[in-house]
Amino acid sequence: MTMIFDKGNVEDFDKELWDAIHAEEERQEHHIELIASENMVSKAVMAAQGSVLTNKYAEGYPGNRYYGGTECVDIVETLAIERAKKLFGAAFANVQAHSGSQANAAAYMALIEAGDTVLGMDLAAGGHLTHGSPVNFSGKTYHFVGYSVDADTEMLNYEAILEQAKAVQPKLIVAGASAYSRSIDFEKFRAIADHVGAYLMVDMAHIAGLVAAGVHPSPVHYAHIVTSTTHKTLRGPRGGLILTNDEALAKKINSAVFPGLQGGPLEHVIAAKAVAFKEALDPAFKDYAQAIIDNTAAMAAVFAQDDRFRLISGGTDNHVFLVDVTKVIANGKLAQNLLDEVNITLNKNAIPFETLSPFKTSGIRIGCAAITSRGMGVKESQTIAHLIIKALVNHDQETILEEVRQEVRQLTDAFPLYKK
């Protein structure tokens, strides 16, 4: 009898699948990645995620499992928990959430009941699907009311949010965004929540790495619960994380994750989270996070100086910014597709007070975490901005687009990802 262990590696056993994986490896190696929610993990993170831990079921929590043989995964998960607590200065951490959306769902379950009113950032203003979109579980389960940004500054107006909170009397206020380029004042959000007797939950998925490094204000001592992903700027595996300083809420969070939403945790992913947390605890990670901010500011400044483009809110304080491209190309979708052709990857994105369809949009979203992971700096960030502009302005000139492709290849060859 031939055992499955005799099948060899993926390349030998499943050529069709391997070809797709290899093609993706080549794409990542030779494309400039500017999707703000993506990053490049270390080989150590990938090794942990591909370990034998994938074989082990471990329903429950360390020291209190429903299965035997969990003494090793208890060590793994405890390492992840303790490192997360240290990294963010939190008293309690749940590392089992499979994703940021699962983390948000668990936080809602811990804090409020179905039908309760929640004040969250409107998707069109930079919020996330799980902040109350009507097509998402959050909007279907709870009564979300959206707050927006100021029409003139395109930034959060905390006085207006306070007045809105007074009017709707939410049980929960959600702060955090997926497409907001400015620093968020969590202290002001907590004051608003306290004023109306609401809980404050912060979704820091996009900025977690910046928070961990101390280059962005932390929400941990202001929010009742903080949720996050472990990828994006934190540069770990795809997964979720929940933090709190309240012991009673920690118990509710744990119950909401298991058995409320999930069964067995993904211990191989939790191991990869533990590796990423250790990487982020290294002093060098602060330099990396600051470089993300510096690179993003440098790239955004190039667009700000070109009157054919409009930089949303006029600048950026973090890893991301939005650009209105409609003076040079019809919509963001066309811009995204065109840039794909020259091996620059980013996404179309609605801008505040959007007038186009969400499937087209007026803007594009640009993030610099992934290029910073490759070692690119301010000079390269400025070059990339000029390449984007060159491609968009000359979107019907194939000769010029080919020039951009060649310049992109020169950059990626100079800053290899895994082929070092």
From Swiss-Prot:
InterPro entries: PyrdxlP-dep_Trfase, PyrdxlP-dep_Trfase_major, PyrdxlP-dep_Trfase_small, Ser_HO-MeTrfase, Ser_HO-MeTrfase-like, Ser_HO-MeTrfase_PLP_BS, SHMT-like_dom
Entry GO terms, CC: cytosol
One Gene Ontology term of the molecular function aspect: pyridoxal phosphate binding
EC class: transferase
Residues that bear N6-(pyridoxal phosphate)lysine: 232
A Pfam family this chain is assigned to: SHMT
Keyword annotations: Amino-acid biosynthesis, Cytoplasm, One-carbon metabolism, Pyridoxal phosphate, Transferase
Residues annotated for (6S)-5,6,7,8-tetrahydrofolate binding in this entry: 123, 127-129, 357-359
Keyword Transmembrane: no
Primary localization class, coarse: cytoplasm
Location(s) in or outside the cell: Cytoplasm
Cofactors that this protein relies on: pyridoxal 5'-phosphate
One GO BP annotation of this record: glycine biosynthetic process from serine
Enzyme Commission numbers on file: 2.1.2.1
Catalysed reaction, written as an equation: (6R)-5,10-methylene-5,6,7,8-tetrahydrofolate + glycine + H2O = (6S)-5,6,7,8-tetrahydrofolate + L-serine
Keyword NAD part of the UniProt annotation: no
Pathway: One-carbon metabolism; tetrahydrofolate interconversion; Amino-acid biosynthesis; glycine biosynthesis; glycine from L-serine: step 1/1
Site (Plays an important role in substrate specificity): 231
Subunit architecture: Homodimer.
HAMAP family: SHMT
Family classification: Belongs to the SHMT family.
Function, in words: Catalyzes the reversible interconversion of serine and glycine with tetrahydrofolate (THF) serving as the one-carbon carrier. This reaction serves as the major source of one-carbon groups required for the biosynthesis of purines, thymidylate, methionine, and other important biomolecules. Also exhibits THF-independent aldolase activity toward beta-hydroxyamino acids, producing glycine and aldehydes, via a retro-aldol mechanism.
Protein name in the entry: Serine hydroxymethyltransferase
